C-alpha cells in the first residue's frame, strides 16, 4: 500500500486533527482519490511479523523497505512474542525504553527491536499469554460490543484473537504514553486473526484510523478447501450459512465484524473483492494489490545460480529428515 490513508464510507465524521471524512463509493480498484492524508504513525499488525508462516510474511517483508524509507521509524510492525529466539528479530533494549517500562506497569510485556529484513523497520513483539486468563471476559466484551460470536471457537482461534486483543492494548498504550492525540495515526490489521485488535481500538481509541485487510476470506478458503466450487458458484453462497455448514462460525464472525467496523476495508485483488462483497456483506473500499521491491525477483542472469543454491538447501533438508544421502538429480516436489 502507498502509506496514505483513504477514508471512505464515513459521512461528516471527525476523528483526530484534520481528519474529516467524506463518503464515496467503492471504486473496484485503486484510482485517483481526493482525500489522501499523510499519516504521522503507522502500526502494521500481523501474526506473521517476525513469524514466517505463509504468504503474508512475504507481503509484509517485501514492502517494509519502501515504507521505512518513506516514514523512517514511524512505521512500526507488531507481531507475536512466541517466547523463543527468532533469527528475524534483533532486540534493542534502548528502543522505546521509557514506554516499555510504562507498558509493563499496565500489564503489557513487550520486546522491541528491528525486523531483520530489507529496511530493518522497528518492531514490537507482544507477549499475549497473560491475557488468556481473561479470555472469557474478552470474548464477552467482543460479543456485547460488536456481535462477535466466539462460542464455537476451536483450533488457532483463541491464540490469534487473544494476541490481537493484546495488540490493540499495546497500540493504545503507545499512543497515550507518547501523547499522540494530535497526530494522524493508522493501525493496520491483516486477516481475521487481528480482528480483535481493530475492534478494541474502535471501542477504546476511535481517534486512531483503522484499516482491515483480508488477503482471502476465511470462509472462502474453507469452501475451496472442502472441494466446493468457490468462484463458479459465488453468487449462490451465503457467508453465514456456509460458516455454519463448514464449522467456521467463530472465524467468520470476527472477520465479518472486523470488515464491517473498519474505517477502511481493503483486499488485494478484484476477485477477492467479489468474495468479500458476497461472503462478508461489505465491499472493500479499495483494492490494494500486493507489491514487491524491484529486486525481489532475481535478474535473468542470476536465476541459474539462485536455483542451484536453493536446490542444494532443499536436498540438505531432505537428507536430514530422511537420514540418508539423496542423489543430486533427485526429483523434488515442494
Task: List the predicted regions and their residue ranges.
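Short hydrophobic targeting helices and cationic amphipathic motifs
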Residues: 5, 19, 26-27
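Alpha-helix boundary/capping motif
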Residues: 10-12
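Composition-driven detection of intrinsically disordered, low-complexity segments
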Residues: 14-15, 34
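Aromatic (phenylalanine/tyrosine) cluster motif
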Residues: 24-26, 33
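Catalytic cores of nucleotide-sugar-dependent glycosyltransferases that transfer UDP/GDP/TDP-activated
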Residues: 33-334
Amino acid at each position: 500500500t502507498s502509506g496514505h490513508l483513504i477514508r471512505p464510507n464515513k459521512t461528516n465524521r471527525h476523528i483526530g486533527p484534520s481528519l474529516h471524512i467524506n463518503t464515496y463509493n467503492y471504486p473496484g480498484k485503486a484510482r485517483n482519490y481526493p482525500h489522501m492524508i499523510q499519516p504521522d504513525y503507522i502500526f502494521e499488525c500481523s501474526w506473521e511479523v517476525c513469524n514466517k508462516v505463509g504468504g503474508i510474511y512475504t507481503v509484509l517483508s517485501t514492502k517494509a523497505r519502501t515504507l521505512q524509507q518513506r516514514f523512517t521509524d514511524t512505521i512500526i510492525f507488531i507481531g507475536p512474542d512466541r517466547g523463543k529466539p527468532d533469527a528475524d528479530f534483533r532486540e534493542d533494549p534502548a528502543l522505546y525504553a521509557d514506554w516499555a517500562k510504562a507498558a509493563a506497569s499496565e500489564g503489557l510485556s513487550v520486546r522491541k527491536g528491528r525486523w531483520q529484513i530489507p529496511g530493518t523497520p522497528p518492531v514490537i513483539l507482544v507477549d499475549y499469554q497473560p491475557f488468556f486468563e481473561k479470555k472469557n471476559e474478552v470474548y464477552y466484551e467482543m460479543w456485547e460490543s460488536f456481535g462477535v460470536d466466539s462460542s464455537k471457537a476451536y483450533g488457532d482461534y483463541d491464540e490469534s484473537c487473544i494476541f490481537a486483543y493484546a495488540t490493540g492494548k499495546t497500540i493504545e498504550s503507545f499512543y497515550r504514553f507518547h501523547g499522540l492525540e494530535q497526530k494522524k495515526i493508522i493501525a493496520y490489521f491483516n486477516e481475521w486473526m487481528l480482528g480483535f485488535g481493530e475492534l478494541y481500538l474502535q471501542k477504546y481509541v476511535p481517534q486512531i484510523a483503522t484499516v482491515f485487510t483480508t488477503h482471502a476470506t476465511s470462509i472462502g478458503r474453507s469452501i475451496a478447501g472442502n472441494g466446493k466450487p468457490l468462484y463458479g458458484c459465488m453468487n449462490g453462497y451465503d457467508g453465514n450459512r456456509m460458516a455454519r455448514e463448514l464449522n467456521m462460525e467463530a472465524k467468520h464472525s470476527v472477520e465479518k465484524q472486523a470488515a464491517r467496523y473498519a474505517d477502511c476495508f481493503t483486499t488485494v485483488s478484484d476477485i477477492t473483492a467479489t468474495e468479500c462483497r458476497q461472503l462478508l456483506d461489505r465491499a472493500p473500499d479499495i483494492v490494494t494489490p500486493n507489491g514487491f521491491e524491484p529486486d525481489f525477483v532475481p535478474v535473468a542472469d542470476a536465476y541459474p545460480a539462485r536455483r542451484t543454491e536453493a536446490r542444494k538447501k532443499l536436498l540438505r533438508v531432505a537428507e536430514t529428515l530422511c537420514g540418508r544421502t539423496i542423489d543430486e538429480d533427485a526429483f523434488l516436489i515442494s
